Amino acid sequence: MPPKAAEKKPTTGGKAPAGKAPAEKKEAGKKTAAAASGDKKKRGKTRKETYSSYIYKVLKQVHPDTGISTRAMSILNSFVNDIFERVATEASKLAAYNKKSTISSREIQTSVRLILPGELAKHAVSEGTKAVTKYSSSAK
């Protein structure tokens, strides 16, 4: 269907007229200067929470003389987020199956056993149990 007469655009070859471009830049500059002077509330920088510092601390405990690249840190951070997401989803399903509204350490432990394979699950469960015991004894 051909465009209506009111919808036709001027044929300038896709470019704006030369006289308008500098004026638009000046106006944009004025807007940013006005925002910087305090007319509007300044928006704070959004914080991105990562596990980078914790991964780095563990790396230094295991291999004190080894470094890690930014890309490798990003991959490990994605890995940790993925595992936590899987465990949380599985624990949520387990709580729903048992008609409970609270995820406890028992659901977390069961979901870890279901998600992680064999020996890895055993080590994860023992480390988790150790961490919960340590926390419980220090909280008193």
Curated annotation (Swiss-Prot):
It comes from the Eukaryota. Signal peptide: none annotated. The modification N6-acetyllysine is found at residues 8-9, 15, 25. Pfam families: Histone. It is found in: Nucleus; Chromosome. Residues 1-48 are annotated as: Disordered. Monoubiquitinated by the ubc2-bre1 complex to form H2BK123ub1. H2BK123ub1 gives a specific tag for epigenetic transcriptional activation and is also prerequisite for H3K4me and H3K79me formation. H2BK123ub1 also modulates the formation of double-strand breaks during meiosis and is a prerequisite for DNA-damage checkpoint activation. GO terms for molecular function: DNA binding; protein heterodimerization activity; structural constituent of chromatin. The nucleosome is a histone octamer containing two molecules each of H2A, H2B, H3 and H4 assembled in one H3-H4 heterotetramer and two H2A-H2B heterodimers. The octamer wraps approximately 147 bp of DNA. This is Histone H2B. It comes from Aspergillus terreus (strain NIH 2624 / FGSC A1156).
